[in-house]
């Protein structure tokens, strides 16, 4: 996978967490934002044992499964989201969670799979907007679809522009956010960054969350485009504005790695591991340790990455296996 796609996909995962209403599910949301996916799933499952039709619990369980990074459980997430829609057809957020689960299934299955699911993904997000015009997450999700999907799959700039304009009439600040997303998608990163930073979400926690997500996205895109100084600057701004953010330290470390600043990168990766113990972080640590000539530590890091049965990209897994053999040989 190209570096741009990898980094932006990583940032997009962060956006999975905003489909629950903060006012009605703050405990769940705290667990998800802290990447405590097993705990969130257990809490949701416990709730469902008592209230089988609980929309919040079904949404949280769906997002916890997706957030875990276990690709083999994506169909389970889709099924849970479908049950949410069936039990709560008028719940906007159930439809959004289904769109996200189908999106994960499509991304995991490749281009042909994406084409097959595109219509259902789009329709789920559109239904979310239709049922609740003030659902910011539904609007952001639909905008992401329009930006990412080509016209033949139901996306396109004209639809994205129309959505941003219509959103501005309902939720002005959200309209500005969607326009910033459109600008970022068109490569106008400085303009997008300025608009995102200038947003005034007030007490709207959901809009605050998406402001954070999109600012991370701009920083990650700078890094992916090899504009490392700009990427670091934006991501450090994220750390100042949103101290609990999970993604900024990883993005900064990746920028440092790409510049050969491996000692600095290791500090950031270690910080990331404290909050996000994922296989790709161990893999990146292995790369930096190897570059510094610390063979034994590099092998240990690669082996930690390989110990995860799921969640490590095929290319990374293959490379980690090759590097371990070479380092031990």
Protein language model regions, located:
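Start-of-helix register in tetratricopeptide repeats
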Residues: 56, 63, 93, 100, ...
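Register position in tetratricopeptide repeats
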Residues: 33, 67-70, 104, 148-149, ...
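TPR-repeat structural position
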Residues: 37, 71-74, 118, 157, ...
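Alpha-helical adaptor scaffolds
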Residues: 144, 208-275
């Amino acid at each position: 996978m190209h570096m741009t796609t990898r980094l932006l996909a990583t940032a997009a995962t962060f956006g999975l967490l905003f489909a629950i209403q903060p006012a009605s599910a703050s405990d769940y949301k705290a667990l998800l934002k802290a990447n405590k996916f097993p705990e969130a799933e257990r809490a949701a499952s416990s709730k469902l044992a008592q209230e089988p039709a609980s929309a919040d619990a079904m949404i949280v369980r769906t997002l916890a499964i997706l957030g875990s990074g276990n690709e083999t459980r994506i169909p389970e997430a889709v099924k849970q989201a479908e049950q949410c829609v069936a039990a709560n057809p008028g719940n906007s957020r159930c439809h959004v969670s289904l769109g996200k689960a189908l999106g994960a299934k499509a991304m995991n299955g490749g281009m042909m799979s994406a084409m097959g699911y595109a219509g259902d993904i789009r329709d789920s997000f559109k239904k979310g907007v239709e049922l609740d015009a003030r659902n910011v997450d539904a609007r952001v999700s639909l905008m992401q679809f329009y930006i990412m999907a080509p016209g033949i799959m139901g996306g396109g700039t004209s639809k994205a522009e129309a959505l941003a304009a219509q959103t501005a009439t309902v939720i002005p600040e959200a309209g500005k956010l969607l326009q910033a997303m459109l600008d970022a998608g068109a490569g106008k990163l400085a303009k997008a960054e300025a608009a995102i930073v200038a947003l005034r979400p007030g007490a709207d926690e959901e809009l605050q969350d998406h402001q954070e997500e999109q600012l991370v996205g701009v920083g990650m895109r700078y890094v992916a485009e090899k504009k490392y100084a700009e990427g670091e600057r934006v991501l450090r701004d994220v750390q100042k504005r949103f101290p609990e953010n999970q993604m900024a330290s990883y993005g900064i470390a990746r920028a440092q790695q790409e510049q050969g600043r491996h000692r600095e990168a290791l500090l950031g990766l270690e910080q990331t591991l404290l909050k996000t113990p994922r296989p790709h972080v161990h893999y990146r640590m292995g790369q930096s340790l190897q570059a510094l000539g610390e063979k034994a530590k590099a092998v240990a890091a690669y082996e930690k990455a390989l110990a995860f049965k799921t969640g490590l990209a095929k290319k990374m897994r293959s490379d980690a296996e090759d590097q371990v053999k070479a380092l031990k040989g």
